[in-house]
Amino acid sequence: ANIGEIDILINNAGYLVKNNFDKLSHEDLLKSYQINVIGIMQAVQVIIPKMNPNGSHIVNISSMGGFQGSVKFPGLTAYSTSKAALCSFTELFAEEYKDSGIKMNCLCLGAVQTEMLEEAFPGFEAPHSPEEMASFIYTFATTQGDFMNGKIIPVSQSTP
């Protein structure tokens, strides 16, 4: 299918394996990084030529687990480090493409009541539903690209 210029791209991919560091398999690490970082980077490579050069915005969805200085949880090494890598990618891309008209920012989400959260933290009740967070992300993506680039932004009332 032929698509026109893209104004907004939201990268929301997540894979979480909960296991102590010494128990993580090679496959656990590969899958975490493939989904949480490499797949996103490859998607961006494909999309760059289609992005609107007169102002477009890429929003990466990371996690408070990958936000420097945040509370860390045992068993989330693969997840949190891969989400931290996504934050670093955001900063590097923003610098490399700063004159292109394409902006990239990263939202580090705290707890949202998803299946992934329930599996990682059974019984934990998050302050936001997926629908509420989707509304926030949409508003951010459509209104903030003109104001910031390369920013890593915590979006959390609680952690996890």
Predicted regions and their residues:
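Residue(s) in the substrate-gating loop at a strand-loop-helix junction
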Residues: S63
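A short, exposed helix-loop element centered on a Lys and neighboring polar residues
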Residues: V44-Q45, E91
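Active-site helix of classical SDR
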Residues: V44, Y79-S82
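Conserved NAD(P)H cofactor-binding loop of Rossmann-fold oxidoreductase domains
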Residues: N12-V17
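Substrate-binding pocket helix/loop in short-chain dehydrogenase/reductase
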Residues: N20-F21, D28-L30
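C-terminal helical subdomain
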Residues: C106-L107, P122-P160
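Active-site-adjacent segment of SDR/Rossmann-fold oxidoreductases
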Residues: M51, V71, E91-I102
